[in-house]
Amino acid sequence: MYNVEKKQYEKIDIKYKFLLGVQNKNNNSEKEYLNLLKTIIKENNIKISRNSKVYSKFGVRMEFNLLDGFPLLTTKKMPWKTILRELIWFINGETDNKILNNKKVHIWDLNSTKEFLESRNLSYEIEGDLGPIYGFQWRHCGAEYIDCDTDYKNKGVDQLKYVINEIKTNPSSRRIIMSSWNPIDIPKM
């Protein structure tokens, strides 16, 4: 597991409870997800987003107990290494898609092209710059976003560090909250 404070990986014992491409009948998180999909399709609530038609349901909440294993879908093949690389990229507070590309991760490619950035009137038109997305909000919430090449060390609120500290020192706190969304930054994303 990645240790944020030491900025290195540490070996921990993780029990994986999934099979790629095979449905696991004891996977409660997957059952919850699939039931949600059935409900959304049955209700047929279609919205038009900026990219396509989307089936949606407002205000849905799903809860996963990580002691039961990582809630990875087993009804379809999931790129496990890609998921981990993207997560580590978020944990590091990165916003430069070229870092992911160097690791053969292409999830964000369409959102970082020059054409996309220009279509959104984004001023930091460095190709590959994704703006103040999830990882930036986790590690530098409230900092003024300039571009993906700027050093944001000790700028903004490090929500991830705060949440980890609270879990360790005050686990019953109702203030253990981390948000990936800062309303002020949404137009820059």
Predicted regions and their residues:
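Terminal, non-catalytic protein-protein interaction segments that mediate quaternary/complex assembly
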Residues: 2-189
